[in-house]
């Protein structure tokens, strides 16, 4: 029991030991519940339930990603938060339907591109056995559009990182934090922005690795930017922007034996269902079209 005087603020650490916990993994999504009750003398005034799970994770140079000591190949997608015709308002049943469809063709991981996910997605990922790359920003101080997050970056980036990490850190499905996607600052490692943001994340969670999605990963690898994160996120590494041979050379370069990396975005396509009418009048649904950057 922790006693706090009225109108006071206190920070306390309580340690509990769980004997032989049932581990969380993709097949056995064992979850526990921490119940925090607030009393005013003997009157119950508030209850806060915190679901969580026990599991270990590690990214390795030679064996990739390890979940509870076992190698798991990440078969992921970058999924934006909108729900098609339903729009961006969250509908938990629709998210569950999305995850079921993704799992039906072998997906076991989701990158929340390119902003913080809805809490409902993480709740379902915990229960349904999906790994989450939790992404906080699409841009930093250097914006991509006239009225994007860069307008608010200076005032809000610390608060937003704290809010995201503190909100999501008890979800066993979350395996990595992503600082951003294809940010302009990746070309300027001397400014130290990546390391600066990484250290903010570590203030609130030091148990998970930090990454970001590099849009020109061969450049950010050469210039040292990717050495400022724990795991290298490589957008479209195969065939473009450096090619697969570059990454094998980079990850195995003397002194880089500790590094690990993953494809944070790849296999981009513009073929889909139906027939569309762009400037060329038609594009088929037979997977005949793809953008130049796609793997």
Where is each model-derived feature located?
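Substrate-binding/catalytic cleft of secreted carbohydrate-active enzymes
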Residues: 99-102, 109-295
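Secreted/periplasmic carbohydrate-active enzymes, especially glycoside hydrolases
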Residues: 1-124, 128-132, 160, 166, ...
